[in-house]
Amino acid sequence: NDPRPGGHPRTMKTLFLIRHAKSSWDDTALPDKDRPLNDRGRRDAPKMGERMAKRDVKPDLILSSPAVRALSTAEIIAKQLDYRRKDIVVNERLYAVEADDLLDVIHKLGDKVERVMLFGHNPELTELAHRLSGKITHMPTCAVAEFTFDAKSWSKIGRIKPAEVLLDYPKKS
């Protein structure tokens, strides 16, 4: 935490919106929630986890949609970040929802949590990323949108502009 002028510590909240990696459509009989990652998804997720690990990203909390493809992506990236798989919280409110529902989940986070990752789906992730940033218009599979807010409470998210916005995805060099 960087001190502000005058010596007051800065309180930051960092939100990572992460779209699940590429999923398989091979078995058309599978319910949508049960679709697994395909080969590209299984390659891309560790790559994105490695990129975050190189930046020393350490989440306090990982929340995932219950869909197999989202939870698998969360588990792969969590491993790269030395986050215990058993500590991933599966949240039904991250599957087949609206951007407002995601924002509601964020607003209810405990304020002691400073860095949270949400693993979910489009179109709601891109919609929320655009709403927060004003500039992100597309999140490809396995994209990571990172928002840093100068805030003490998660309830401020969506009401204040982020201090920093980063977007990374597997095909970005």
Name every feature range the model reports, one short phrase each.
Residues 103-108:
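Short, surface-exposed amphipathic charged segments that create phosphate/polyanion-binding patches used
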Residues 135-165, 170:
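Domain-level recognition of soluble alpha/beta enzyme cores
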Residues 27, 128, 157:
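Residues that scaffold the ATP/ADP-binding catalytic core of kinase and kinase-like folds
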Residues 13-14, 18-94, 101, 136-139, ...:
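Active-site-proximal alpha-helix that buttresses catalytic centers in soluble enzyme cores
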Residues 1-11:
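Short, Lys/Arg-enriched N-terminal segments with co-localized hydrophobic residues
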Residues 109-117, 122-143, 151:
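Non-DNA-binding regulatory cores of transcription-related proteins
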